[in-house]
């Protein structure tokens, strides 16, 4: 369960995920300079529409994919609130893959591995880029790019993983079914 893990907020405070017991949680690694950055808009809409019903969103900025999350935690927060009016909690910029990855992400990936990209304008580009770098990329559970999302149910179980190419409507349906 995710309740065994902690993250650090953008303000440097430790946040135990046990605080989210009884809530549906959407965990997403983000970046401010990515082609998927406009996903902040529908994420904020999800938060506004379902927060009162028990949805929490954890925004975890990550600079591991194309260095697309430059700046300090404060600068990232300012960007998101200024351009997308985000109100959901934003965590400290962190790694989601590799030796310095958050333990939370080690757990998330162990529960829901990569199952492929959905049809999207960036699908071919992403697949080409990854296969050139690593022929075995598709068989690894690693986070592939910014805006990969994990949905956690009210009991703390990871129930779904959505790649950045997933339609937000699919994510919303998954969340609604759990609320």
Residue ranges and their predicted role:
Residues 1-18, 36:
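N-terminal "domain-start" segment that seeds a small globular fold
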Residues 23-24, 32-61, 80-84:
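Conserved helix-turn-beta segment immediately C-terminal to the redox Cys motif
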Residues 24-26, 149:
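Hydrophobic beta-strand anchors of alpha/beta hydrolase catalytic cores
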Residues 51-71, 87-98:
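Thiol-based oxidoreductase modules, predominantly thioredoxin-like and allied folds used
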Residues 79-81, 85-166:
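Thiol/selenol-based redox catalytic cores and closely related redox-interacting motifs
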Residues 159-179:
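Non-catalytic, surface beta->alpha helical segment in thiol-disulfide oxidoreductase systems
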């Amino acid at each position: 369960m995710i309740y065994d893990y902690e993250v650090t907020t953008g303000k440097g405070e430790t946040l135990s995920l046990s605080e989210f017991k009884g809530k549906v949680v959407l965990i997403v690694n983000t970046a401010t300079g990515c082609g998927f950055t406009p996903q902040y808009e529908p994420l904020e809409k999800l938060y506004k529409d379902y927060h009162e019903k028990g949805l929490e969103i954890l925004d975890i900025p990550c600079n591991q994919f194309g260095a697309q999350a430059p700046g300090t935690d404060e600068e990232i927060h300012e960007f998101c609130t200024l351009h997308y009016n985000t109100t959901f909690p934003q965590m400290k910029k962190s790694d989601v893959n590799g030796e310095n990855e958050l333990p939370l992400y080690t757990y998330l990936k162990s529960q829901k591995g990569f199952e492929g990209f959905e049809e999207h304008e960036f699908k071919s580009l992403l697949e080409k880029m990854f296969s050139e770098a690593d022929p075995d990329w598709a068989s690894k559970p690693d986070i592939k790019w910014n805006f990969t999302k994990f949905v956690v149910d009210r009991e703390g179980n990871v129930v779904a993983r959505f790649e950045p190419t997933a339609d937000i409507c699919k994510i919303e349906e998954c969340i609604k079914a759990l609320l």
